[in-house]
Amino acid sequence: MAIHKWKLWKQRCSTCSDALSTTTTVEQLSNTPTTNPLTTCVGAKEAQTQQRKRQRLTEPDSSTISPLSVDNTNNQIHCGSGSTNTGGHQSATQTAFIVHLKGDTNCLKCFRYRFTKHKGLYKNVSSTWHWTSNTKTGIVTIVFDSAHQRETFIKTIKVPPSVTLSLGIMTL
């Protein structure tokens, strides 16, 4: 540690006298921060002191934010046996019909590139992504404007046997 301090001190000095031995200089640096009359350093006082680390910026307390303040709509999808909502009803919020393709990441990437021939059959396609807990299975999300467009896509595109297809609705 003392040698490291000495090297830092030596680097900060633009002109230093080598009249003192290394041992004397190290002892001086480790004991007191005063300067020796035989050695002089030219430079600003701020340059000779070690810089402190920057303070972290404080983030607002997230515990004060209620779930309703993030999304001020109170729309719920009811999927119970007595519910008439089958998942196809679009409420006041923006919902999108989606398909998740799950499988090997390289297979999904190649399959996704083949979609460019059928651009009218979907709205958007995500890149290949995966959950952090499961890195072996990749997922591609395809977004559609309507349920009819999604059905046309499923009928037109031949899905490889190693890829599984899941239907869903996503709130945007």
Curated annotation (Swiss-Prot):
Mind telling me which InterPro entries this protein's record contains? E2/EBNA1_C_sf (IPR035975), Nucleotide-bd_a/b_plait_sf (IPR012677), Papillomavirus_E2_C (IPR000427)
Q: Which Pfam families match?
A: PPV_E2_C
Record's compositionally biased regions (Polar residues): 60-69
MF terms (GO), sorted A to Z: DNA binding; DNA-binding transcription factor activity
Q: Give start-end ranges for the coiled-coil region(s).
A: none
Q: List the disulfide bonds.
A: none
Ordered alphabetically, the record's keywords are: Host nucleus
Residue ranges of region Disordered?
Answer: 45-69
Annotated localization: Host nucleus
Q: Which residues are the signal sequence here?
A: none
Name any GO cellular component annotation.
host cell nucleus
Q: Please list the GO biological process terms of this entry.
A: regulation of DNA replication
Principal subcellular localization? host cell
Q: What does this protein do?
A: Plays a role in limiting the replication of viral DNA in keratinocytes. Recruits the host NCoR/SMRT complex to viral replication foci to mediate repression of both viral replication and transcription.
Family, per entry: Belongs to the papillomaviridae E8^E2C protein family.
**Protein name listed in UniProt:** Protein E8^E2C
Q: Which organism is it from?
A: Human papillomavirus 51
